[in-house]
Amino acid sequence: MAKEASGKVTLQHVATKAGVGSATVDRVLNERGNVSDSVRKRVIEAARELGLRRILPSAYRRTVRINFILSRTERPLLKRMATEVGRLSQRCEEGLYIQRTLLDREDPESVAKAMLRGAYDAVAICAPDHAFVHQAIDTLARRDCPVVTLISDVPGSARLAYAGTDHVKAGRSAAFFLARMAPRLDGLGKVIVLCHDEGFQAHAERIRGFAEQLEADDLGLKLAEIVRGGDDPLLSEIKLKETLRRHPETVGIYNAGGANRGVIAAIAANLLPRRPLFLGHELTNFTWHCLRDGRMTLAIDQSPELQAQYALEVVMHHYGFEGAVRALPPYVSDVPIVLYGPQNLPDVPPD
C-alpha cells in the first residue's frame, strides 16, 4: 500500500507491513495489551522501518531472561568472562535479567543439558562443536530462544550469532611472529603446538591458521607435533615434556589453548639445548608476569569482556531494545584480538 500523498506514515501502513490488522497496531502502539510477544515485536519493527513519527514502546513488555552458560571458570579466560557477566547483570537496563550458570564440566552432553534446562528467552554459551550442542541449539531455535556463541563458535548450527574473535587470524598472527623471531638450528627449527583438543572450534581454527601461515612463509620452521592437553596444566606439562624429549630441535611453542602454566613448567624443566620462544593466549595475572620477566614471548588476548558485552547487545537488538547500537544484523562480531608483549603491558596486572 502506498503512503498518503503527504508522505505521512499511517497505522494502516504499519499494519500492512507487519501483516496484521490496524486494530492490532493500535493496541501495540498504545500498549493496551492482549498481543503476543512475536506480533508485538513485528509491529514495532515495521513502525521503525517505516519511520513512524511517534515514541515507540519497547518491542517486549515482559522481562527478557538471558542465560550465560560458562564451563570450568577456574580457567583465567572463563573467569574473566564470568566476572564481566556478573558486572553486566548489575547494570543492565530495565526489562533485562541476566542469569549466570557456571558448570564444573564442559563435555558436550553436560553443556547441552544445561542449555535446555530452565525457561529463558536467550542463551549465550561457550561450547564445543559437537552433535549434542548442535541439537540443543536447534531445539532452542525452534522454541524461539536465540543462542549466541561465545569464545568458540558452533558453525552450521541454528545459532543467532557468534560473539567471539577471528581465531584463524589469531593463529596466523602467532605463526607470523614466531617464524620471524625464533632462532634456527642449522637453518631449521621445529615448533610444537599445544591445545585443548580440536573439538573446540576456536582451537581448531587457531591451529589451522597457524599451520597455513607457517607453510606460506616457508622460513624454515616445521610444525612437529600437536599436543592435546585438555587445558589441564598438569596433563599439558607432562605431555609437553614427553614431546620436547622427542623433538630437541624445538625452537618455539604455540599454546592455542589455556594451559599456559603447563607450558611454563615444561620449559622450566630445561629439556632443550636452548630456551624456546613461547606464544600463547590471554592476558591474565600469570601471563602478565611471564611476559614481563621473559618467560613468555607474546600473548594474544581475545577480550572476553567485549565478547560478553557484544553477546548482550545482540540479544537486546533481537528483542527490540533501543540501547543496542553496536550489534546489527547480520551480527558480525567486531571484537578484536590484542597482541601483548613486555613493552605494552598494562601498568597493573589483571586480577
Please report, for each region that a protein language model flagged, where it lies by residue.
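Short beta-strand elements in bilobed, periplasmic/extracellular small-molecule ligand-binding domains
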Residues: 85, 89-112, 190-192, 214-233, ...
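Hydrophobic alpha-helical
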Residues: 122-141, 210, 227-286
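Hydrophobic alpha-helical segments within soluble ligand-binding/sensing domains
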Residues: 163-189, 236-237, 283, 287, ...
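Hinge/cleft segment of the Venus flytrap/periplasmic-binding protein
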Residues: 46, 198, 214, 303-351
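Short, solvent-exposed amphipathic alpha-helices that sit
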Residues: 76-91, 170-174, 201-220, 262-263, ...
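N-terminal helix-turn-helix DNA-binding module of bacterial transcription factors
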Residues: 1-58
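Flexible loop/hinge segments that line or gate small-molecule binding clefts
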Residues: 132-169, 284-292, 296
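Amphipathic helical "hinge" segments at domain boundaries
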Residues: 54-110
